[in-house]
């Protein structure tokens, strides 16, 4: 029998599908990536073609093995991590979607959300699902599809249609329609799942008129869900044994499995999650209560804060403002000046996320004087990412009563040393950057590997988690608080900018 030397993580993201092969030392052997089309039918609407998600993801799996010259019988297991909340409804019989995938960023269900608020459901939804009422989550997207595709609700009642987030869709395709499952982390992002009883919430299903028959079975994040054949019939059968939504996978990949440990992912937006152990902490400060993975993939809880504009604000400097040619240049120009010369950039281009949740805020630059140049604005834009992270951390510490001692970081922007140092300065906390940057894929690989005994336990993984660089605060508390007070003043003035009917 061939030795099982590798784990494959499938990382299905918002703009691309990736496959990553890792060995027993958690080193990356090979990566394959394919982008796919973003569909914008109307302003504020975002869709993907589910068949293209499947085509790109399945081809990266074949490609990554070929690239590394690994045969499929050397693979111990496959783990899946995915863009969360994105919603797919398909026919059970044919496996064909009845509508495009409605993506997490899509705002088309804003009106449905307003109705839920008017019906006084905010408190119920926050208490039972851990979420705020927002188009971001899957529930209203499923309702929208059932409302707009003729006859679909009746078909769903008859058991002819299935709903799934992206993880569920991929497993359904990989097992030729034999397995219809999701995991607790993905279920906790639907606004249909009761995070205390760990079951679909009957009241939410009734309110949104979603038939229970179409929902997947919900399982732990680390167990064998089914097998997939690589190389068609008669090919190698490989267990699929790990699932987690991308941010929860990153939390696990950073080994934040103890209460009070937190990570921040700096991507297009920022996502900070703090593990709160076995207790679900209800946020009084605009954060989400969500499900995370415990040491063996069991249910833990986490607080989550999402910042909409992080890396995206650097892209704005490059693409719209033409102040830089490449995102990497931002660090160079930011360090050409001593400070921002009193300037604050509030990148509320699509409103503000946690802890403000103000869809009517808009981007602004404050504190302009005659001496301000492009470098000051570039520096202030980078600093805004760190300030927004502090906003979320303050809310987390207030909710949980836990004082953070170190923040683990990952994502594209962590390569920026200026930003990481400023982050440490403004938080007054150590910032730890890991050696392996692919922590989302790492989390999915860990969950899959633990389920099949490829790794025995977390202690074995702890040895592999190397911190590449630690940033420590380099400014005084008075200076830190003075700068942060300026940020708070700027945010206040950017809020409620856009007119809206009360």
From Swiss-Prot:
Keyword Transferase: yes
GO-annotated biological processes: glycerol catabolic process; glycerol metabolic process; glycerol-3-phosphate metabolic process
Free-text activity regulation comment from the record: Activity of this regulatory enzyme is affected by several metabolites. Allosterically and non-competitively inhibited by fructose 1,6-bisphosphate (FBP) and unphosphorylated phosphocarrier protein EIIA-Glc (III-Glc), an integral component of the bacterial phosphotransferase (PTS) system.
Positions bound to sn-glycerol 3-phosphate: 14, 84-85, 136, 246
Annotated binding of ADP, by residue: 14, 18, 268, 311, 412, 416
Pathway info: Polyol metabolism; glycerol degradation via glycerol kinase pathway; sn-glycerol 3-phosphate from glycerol: step 1/1
Catalysed conversion reaction: glycerol + ATP = sn-glycerol 3-phosphate + ADP + H(+)
InterPro entries: ATPase_NBD (IPR043129), Carb_kinase_FGGY (IPR000577), Carb_kinase_FGGY_CS (IPR018483), FGGY_C (IPR018485), FGGY_N (IPR018484), Glycerol_kin (IPR005999)
GO MF annotation: an example: ATP binding
CDD domains according to UniProt: FGGY_EcGK_like
Keyword field: Allosteric enzyme, ATP-binding, Glycerol metabolism, Kinase, Metal-binding, Nucleotide-binding, Transferase, Zinc
Signal sequence range: none
Top-level taxon in the UniProt lineage: Bacteria
GO cellular component: cytosol
Disulfide cysteine pairs (residue numbers): none
Binding site for glycerol: 84-85, 136, 246-247
Top enzyme class: transferase
Annotated family: Belongs to the FGGY kinase family.
Oligomeric and partner information: Homotetramer and homodimer (in equilibrium). Heterodimer with EIIA-Glc. Binds 1 zinc ion per glycerol kinase EIIA-Glc dimer. The zinc ion is important for dimerization.
Protein purpose: Key enzyme in the regulation of glycerol uptake and metabolism. Catalyzes the phosphorylation of glycerol to yield sn-glycerol 3-phosphate.
Protein name: Glycerol kinase
Organism: Shigella dysenteriae serotype 1 (strain Sd197)
